[in-house]
Amino acid sequence: SKMAVMVTGIPEGKQVQLKIMAWWTGKEGNNFDGGNPNQKTYTLQNGFNLIDYDYTYEGLAYVSYYDAHPETMPELTVHFVNGIVNGYLSPDKTNQEMYDLCAKAPNLHMDCWGNKVHSVWTSNGLKKYCKDVNGNPKGYRQFMNVLDSLIAWEHRSLGFEKYDRLPNTRSFAYVNYTYYMFQGGYGVSFHHNQEQRVLSCKTLITNDDDAIWGLSHEWGHQHQMQPYFCWGGLGEVSNNVQSYYNITHM
């Protein structure tokens, strides 16, 4: 399919890309078949852009616009002329609004854009399983707060708060179709058949230390910055400090 994208505001000499991620690639199996999404990358320019997306499965579009000093960069305006709007979940929406987005989502997957964590799950899984700590449906805001808290606690245990080095970025989590849990090329990943556990605030907060351990352990790999928290022979050990710390807090 072809999509028209209009862009304004790209600074001269700055590269901005459109990345279309097909989180479902038609594979479900072992040996990491279905373990990672298919990514198509297109360079954007000011004005008219014709995006020729030729992958078999539909994807979600993300604008990649980075700089070492983002506060100095101008905002972009990006208009998908004939794109289909999937929407995304974020704390500024009500739980009902987010439920409706999941129920009507044209894509198999949905983005959750928290304050410290960006995650992607199946739209149906979010609609069915994302309940609050009391078991009530529509626990989206609380769910994003739980994930944000896990990252905030990891940053605290690493001294980022104490030394005023908190990153202004988001950690990532996404659903996969091959394996229970792993740290993938993009972030922490859980198999789609685990969504009943990892999307439920009641389960995460009250009775599933393994899920908290897994999220914290795998995100802990991202925080193993040599030589500060990653030493020889301890690649699967030092990050368990985050797991213990987060389970204790939760």
Give the positions of each predicted feature.
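Catalytic cores of extracellular degradative/oxidative enzymes
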Residues: 99, 108-250
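Short, flexible coil/linker segments at or flanking structured domains
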Residues: 41, 49-51, 100, 107, ...
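Short, motif-level signal for alpha-helix interfacial/capping segments enriched in acidic residues
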Residues: 8-9, 65-67, 93, 195-196, ...
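Low-complexity, Pro/Ser/Thr- and charge-rich linker/hinge segments at domain boundaries
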Residues: 77-111
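Context-gated lysine
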Residues: 2, 12-14, 19, 27, ...
